[in-house]
Amino acid sequence: MKSKSYYVYVLRCEDGSFYTGYTTCLEKRLDSHRAGRGARYTQQHGVVRLVHSETFATRGEAMRRERQVKRLSHSEKEKLQSRQGNE
């Protein structure tokens, strides 16, 4: 049986802000954000693109990382975006 993966992701919104969340199915969650069925924040601010994602083995790990990323400053999230592009 395949083990479930958990993803922490960062989206860039139309107004330049970032949205951070976690999910078990990244593609499905991105589709729901883009279709306006995602979080209220992304419904109001629009989604431009996925700029960062990380994979975790447990829900707890993903939730801890999500909290860490949400606490990052805007410039620190910009660095995450830059680092993702260089990998």
PLM segments and residue spans:
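GIY-YIG nuclease catalytic motif and its immediate N-terminal context
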Residues: M1-F56, G60-E87
